[in-house]
């Protein structure tokens, strides 16, 4: 099918002084979709895109695996064997949102945990010079979500990729530098949907720009 997803997401942004807004997200089959934003409700972007608010809830597959068919045991096992084995100096903890939700389909599709960890280590090492850009005062989760974003960017197999992290409070120069870093490892023919109150870098060829 031409349309891979057409999801609506109601962003609860009252905590940062903004009103709720409805975002419509559309992508085509074969696209990699990166989303940069910070959902304030319990649901994640992944859940929105892959089921909870879709009319075909529970039918979307990543790597041939339906994430909603995962059992609690499978999820717990993956967190322990894969995420829990990631060195703590990378700031990665099992509670980080969406790590298991995006990577678990890879695990179930036959991608071993060591391979995932190796890719995470490699990418994190490459982007470490930008590490301080994510350490923003007043955003206690920024650093963790930045590492989560690195994981999002390196997992190339799923058709939908979620790029999730705070960029609202960095300067335009730093934001451009961050974009350039992720652009170098972004899969070809991918789509980036930027969910943020901050302006997008001018050099980005946006297929679609959604602003919260």
Per-segment meaning from a language model:
Residues 2, 115-132:
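Conserved ABC ATPase "signature" region
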Residues 50:
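Helix-to-loop junction immediately C-terminal to a conserved catalytic motif
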Residues 58-68:
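Conserved ABC transporter NBD signature motif
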Residues 67-83:
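ABC ATPase NBD coupling module
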Residues 89, 96-108:
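Q-loop/switch helix immediately C-terminal to the Walker
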Residues 136-144:
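Conserved ABC ATPase signature
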Residues 149-151:
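Hydrophobic anchor residue at the start of the ABC signature
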């Amino acid at each position: 099918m031409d349309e891979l997803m057409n999801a609506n997401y109601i962003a609860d942004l009252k905590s940062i002084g903004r009103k709720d807004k409805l975002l419509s997200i559309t992508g085509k089959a074969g696209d990699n979709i990166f989303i940069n934003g910070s959902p304030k409700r319990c649901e994640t972007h992944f859940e929105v895109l892959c089921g909870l608010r879709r009319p075909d809830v529970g039918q979307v597959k990543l790597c041939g695996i339906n994430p909603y068919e995962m059992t609690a045991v499978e999820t717990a096992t993956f967190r322990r064997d894969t995420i829990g084995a990631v060195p703590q100096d990378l700031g990665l903890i099992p509670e980080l949102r969406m790590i298991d939700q995006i990577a678990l389909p890879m695990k179930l599709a036959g991608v071993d945990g060591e391979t995932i960890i190796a890719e995470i280590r490699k990418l994190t090492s490459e982007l470490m010079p930008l590490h301080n850009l994510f350490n923003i005062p007043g955003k206690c989760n920024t650093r963790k979500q930045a590492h989560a974003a690195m994981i999002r960017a390196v997992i190339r197999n799923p058709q939908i990729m979620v790029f999730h992290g705070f960029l609202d409070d960095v300067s335009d120069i730093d934001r451009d530098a961050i974009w350039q870093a992720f652009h170098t490892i972004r899969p070809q023919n991918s789509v980036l949907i930027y969910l943020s109150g901050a302006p997008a870098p001018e050099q980005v060829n946006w297929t679609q720009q959604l602003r919260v």
